[in-house]
Amino acid sequence: MQGTKNNIYTVSRLNGEVRQILEGQLGKIWLNGEISNFSSPSSGHWYLTLKDHSSQIRCAMFKGRNQTVSFKPINGQQVLVKGAISVYEPRGDYQLLIESMLPAGDGLLAQQFDALKMKLAAEGLFAADTKRPLPKNIQRIGVITSPTGAAIRDVLHVLARRDPSIEVIIYPTQVQGETAAQSICQAINIANQRLEVDVLLLTRGGGSLEDLWCFNSEALAHTIYNSALPVVSAVGHEVDTTISDYVADIRAPTPSAGAELLSQDSDNKAQKLATALSRLQQSAKHYQLKQERRLSLLEHRLQRQDPKRTLQQFEQRFDEMQLRLESALLNRLHILSRRQQLLASRLEQQSPKHKLTIEGNRLSYLASRLQDALQDKLSQSEQRIKYAAHQLETVSPLATLSRGYSITTDIHNQVVDSADKLTIGDSLQTRLRHGQVISTVTQIKPLE
């Protein structure tokens, strides 16, 4: 008896331990049953009883949870609910706290969805490190959808508004029904065989869970995962989530959002043109400064070398640099001109003609100024070279001969600068401006 008395429970303790046991062991469960005694007081909470042919359980679904239910429950309706067992200790009643509620048919699909989601996650199909980035410059989009649905109209409308230069290739497929998943897989495989697009957009409009069920196919999940092309999933409305959303590289909430994700605003492309012009100016300026430094260095070297040979070499290098500079400038201008023409073609449907005209005139003006500046600089450099060559020629021995002087050497080619070094009979060579004179010493006279 003593041991029994030591284990006497209070009512509160009993209800508390029962609550811990039930909540700890059962956790969250799915429960199928028929609604009865449904009530919705002003607090916004729902209270009901779920029953089958022989038993029943009280349930509660609080306001924050029941706002996500897409239908109004009624007595006699079969539903599938997900929740956790809890004990209401003041009365000793146990009840089910409902977190989500679906009609019985949709509830079975939801269970299958959760099971497949857990399986694919365990296989690594949802891992973040497997997601492929979108191409930076998307030129062609492959759209996998029904060619007659609302989704393709929304996608084409958004692309035409934001970036009409993007090409669209439609891979027609079923998007609802028993064979839809297989049809979508075939479309993805065809796109990967052709490799004619930069990215795939898998899309359709909204619908019920059953309508969108083909996008919860395990085979489709593996096809998306194995695709060599990046895949964007834009299925249903923002509240709809499918297995394809988890496997795809990027998920968009709606077809229109998917099209916006894959396109760029035309104003951004105009900004890129302005950036390209600025880079061209900086590159030309840098190249000009570099050539000026090279010219200065060559001038310095020229002063320490033979004038004619150095001048010839420098003139040749100057011509080469001029040709290379002009070629580089023309290539830059040609590339920029082609970019401008391409952007003008893409933007033509939106008629930004005024902006393109301004940018084109600005480009021509800058190119003209750059060409004039380079030509002026080259002319100045050429004048400095000619002046330096003239200065060197003025101090050249050859220039001295042209003024009537001569240079006399002996038979050993040594310069004779004094009569004291000569004897009668020595042979001499005298270099004049034009030619040489060979002579023999017959008489030596000292200066008086």
From Swiss-Prot:
It catalyses: Exonucleolytic cleavage in either 5'- to 3'- or 3'- to 5'-direction to yield nucleoside 5'-phosphates. The gene is xseA. One of its GO terms (biological process) is DNA catabolic process. Its EC number is 3.1.11.6. It is an enzyme of class 3 (hydrolase). Heterooligomer composed of large and small subunits. The keyword Coiled coil does not apply. GO terms for molecular function: exodeoxyribonuclease VII activity; nucleic acid binding. GO terms for cellular component: cytoplasm; exodeoxyribonuclease VII complex. This is Exodeoxyribonuclease 7 large subunit. HAMAP family: Exonuc_7_L (MF_00378). Its main location: cytoplasm. Belongs to the XseA family. Keywords: Cytoplasm, Exonuclease, Hydrolase, Nuclease. It is found in: Cytoplasm. Pfam families: Exonuc_VII_L, tRNA_anti_2. The keyword Cytoplasm applies. Bidirectionally degrades single-stranded DNA into large acid-insoluble oligonucleotides, which are then degraded further into small acid-soluble oligonucleotides.
